[in-house]
Design a protein with these regions (language model features):
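Active-site proximal loops enriched in glycine and acidic residues that flank catalytic Cys/His/Asp
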Residues: 204-207, 250-252, 262, 278
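Histidine-centered active-site microenvironments of extracellular/periplasmic hydrolases
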Residues: 255-285
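Metal-dependent active-site segment of extracytoplasmic phospho-/sulfohydrolases and closely related
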Residues: 232, 236-263
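Feature for exported/extracytoplasmic and membrane-associated proteins, marking the mature portion
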Residues: 1-238, 273-277, 285-347
Length: 347
């Protein structure tokens, strides 16, 4: 299984030429790093230089930077390249109210904000609650991709109801933080452990665009990175042995400026960090080339430069973990999708 998560910024104001340190609020990642399940890819991002959130996110989720005409998402194309004649309706799951750009395409995907409501909610008679839940979702959806997966979604409703999502206790004392992100990952863990045939899942965490009073040690960024790392760590603990066959990748549309602005915040930047976590991951290591933070090394004199294309990281996960060998169709025009260019963060 592969989990794709959309996040935003990770940065350390104490990073120097010779060393880099993480934020104190990311301490939940320390055991995963020590166990060599967690790896870092620094200075990763898109080669496109847009500073627009909308355009940058669209490029990252379509997997075609600089091309606005792409209709489907990279993760959907990846699944399309894997023949699964008896695929589960839960093959591709997104936690949220709509199918994200990443999963848009010909392969059916299911979006849900809450698996309990998805399974038992509805507007009609109690005896037909699941059917009514699906009908309500179908009528309210404005996403043509979701409309095209009606039969699959209806089957998913029936399967999920039989899994009894109301009764779930995270394993091994996994403690998910309060908030939508932690709740999303808890529900993904439920789906995976219910053996419903999940192959890929998507969750996101927003609220990172801090141009004012950012607070990397105490404040907005500290709070978000704490929630981010604690939720992922809890998810990993909750999966137990299933984590050995799981790869989690975090990504964002861009990073932030290398220096603080006049309002104690940071502005839209270029390179960012990607975290990869899982049983197959060769963790406890940092991958990629560090470009440096000296004035002459910054992109356009203000941002961390991109030295690893985000598609390199994703290509390796898709090829070596999911078994997709036709990466040219997943990332058209991207030359470094060839296995010879992999970072080799997977064992």
């Amino acid at each position: 299984m592969m989990i794709a998560e959309r996040t935003c910024r990770f940065a350390s104001e104490s990073a120097t030429e010779s060393s880099a340190s993480s934020l104190p609020s990311l301490t939940a990642f320390k055991p995963l790093w020590d166990q060599k399940h967690l790896a870092i890819v620094h200075a990763a991002g898109s080669p496109d230089n847009t500073r627009s959130h909308f355009d940058a996110q669209d490029y990252m989720e379509s997997g075609t930077p600089g091309v606005k005409s792409t209709e489907d998402g990279w993760l959907n194309r990846a699944l399309a390249g894997l023949k699964e004649p008896d695929a589960s309706p839960f093959r591709a799951v997104a936690m949220g109210g709509a199918v994200p750009r990443t999963l848009a395409g010909t392969v059916p995907a299911v979006a849900m904000s809450d698996i309990r409501g998805f399974a038992v909610g509805g507007r009609g008679p109690a005896g037909n609650a699941a059917s009514n839940s699906f009908e309500a979702m179908y009528e309210q959806s404005v996403d043509s991709v979701l409309h095209g997966t009606g039969n699959e979604t209806f089957e998913a409703v029936k399967m999920l109801k039989s899994a009894d999502p109301e009764k779930y206790t995270p394993a091994a004392g996994a403690d998910y933080p309060r908030g939508r992100f932690g709740d999303s990952l808890r529900q993904v863990a439920q789906l995976v452990k219910a053996n419903l045939g999940v192959e890929v899942a998507f969750a996101d965490i927003g609220g990172w665009d801090h141009h004012v009073n950012e607070g990397s040690v105490q404040g907005q960024i500290a709070n978000l990175t704490k929630e981010f790392s604690q939720a992922i760590a809890a998810f990993w603990i909750d999966l137990g042995d299933l984590g050995e066959d799981t790869v989690i990748v975090t990504m964002s549309e861009f990073g932030r400026t290398a220096r603080e602005n006049g309002n104690r915040g940071t502005d839209h930047g270029h390179a960012n960090v990607m975290f990869v976590l899982g049983g197959p991951v060769k963790g406890g290591r940092v991958y990629g080339r560090w470009p440096g933070l000296q004035p002459g090394q910054l992109y356009e004199g203000r941002d961390l430069a991109v030295t690893t294309d985000f598609r390199q990281v994703l290509s390796e996960a898709l090829n070596r973990h999911l078994g997709n060998s036709n990466l040219a169709k997943v990332f058209p025009g991207f030359e470094k999708s060839d296995p010879r260019n992999f970072l080799r963060y997977l064992g």
